[in-house]
Curated annotation (Swiss-Prot):
PROSITE patterns: XYLOSE_ISOMERASE (PS51415). This is Xylose isomerase. HAMAP family: Xylose_isom_A (MF_00455). GO terms for molecular function: magnesium ion binding; xylose isomerase activity. Homotetramer. It comes from Burkholderia ambifaria (strain ATCC BAA-244 / DSM 16087 / CCUG 44356 / LMG 19182 / AMMD) (Burkholderia cepacia (strain AMMD)). It comes from the Bacteria. InterPro entries: Xyl_isomerase-like_sf, Xylose_isom_bac, Xylose_isomerase. Belongs to the xylose isomerase family. It is an enzyme of class 5 (isomerase).
Amino acid sequence: MSYFEHIPAIRYEGPQSDNPLAYHHYDAEKRVLGKTMAEHLRIAVCYWHTFVWPGHDIFGQGAFQRPWQQPGDALERARLKADAAFEFFTKLGTPFYTFHDTDVAPEGDSLREYAANFARMVDYLGERQQASGVRLLWGTANLFSHPRFAAGAATNPNPDVFAWAATQVCHALDATHRLGGENYVLWGGREGYETLLNTDLKRERDQFARFLSMVVEHKHRIGFKGALLIEPKPQEPTKHQYDYDVATVHGFLVQYGLQNEIRVNIEANHATLAGHSFHHEIANAFALGVFGSVDANRGDPQNGWDTDQFPNSVEELTLAFYEILRHGGFTTGGMNFDAKVRRQSVDPEDLFYGHVGAIDVLALALERAAVLVENDRLDALRRQRYAQWDDAFGQKILSGGYTLQSLADDALARGVDPRHASGAQERLENIVNQAIYGLR
């Protein structure tokens, strides 16, 4: 008997259905702005929270009793986990999945064992992908869980740790390429510091940049055509991480000449931990030319840590999708659910409830964002606000037609006396509410 045998495939039944194991708003084939919902959303399920996390927290042991988490042969349990995962993906009807290397294969007791185990499981995942049609959105390497990475991976003071991390990324990037992955993600969970008293900031930044340059070189050497993505996060597990937010990552990439090689994977909960909105980080990524993909989840505003809950705010996601749609949508990226059920949600059905509800929220937000984009009054008002910069005077300033002195002389000669114009924030917020709630 399979783990999810008693659960039927999830189908679209419409908003009037009261079936908790059905989609009420997500109709994969429904067309929105010329593409299907499935094509717009590019939904992925993550391996780590869904099949690896045992339901523990810092105060208690694992609450889940998944068959693949029981004692036994490590590779056999990994295959059992993969079987359950692909059954889940197939029944949910999601086109993509994501993984860390050590999510899918046992790490073993040495680097050689790691490589051998991972190679076997990559073969098995390839078979499961071919049988199911489910594809890999992105792969990555876990460079944060093992104690060897306590002081970082690329930024570690020990070059042997750097070498171990490089080996994992080499194998994980090769595996992602072989499995047809469309992106490769680099999350520096331990690339930061606990105290400045023992930290050489310049050295660690240089090490991190060297590591990334090696990844870029390897990508091109093996012919991987997907995108390389850094996932920003300000802290946790370290006190301060070097990939703090989108702007910080972009500045780092520019400093080391990597801005044309690496983009960002934006997680909603990481944005809020950095003191930003999800909307801000996505808009900033597009403004800086580094938008890649999204981890869809949410945090708890009463908690100061990464709770990784399923997204449930149509309002928040509507603005996120508005930015994505008006910039042309995803290319290699997608909406990956970096989210987990709560520790008390121990039934197999709970995994479906979490994903089904979140996918419906994505669908609602996509449709509301499409309303904003179709008759883009927000953009019209935004362009009107900056219209004077498109006139001859504004263009002369931007094109270098003035020096600071000549501009000051011109302003004095003309007696410049600008008047303050309304930002119309309340009107703009009403437009958003009209799109979301159908208000008139």
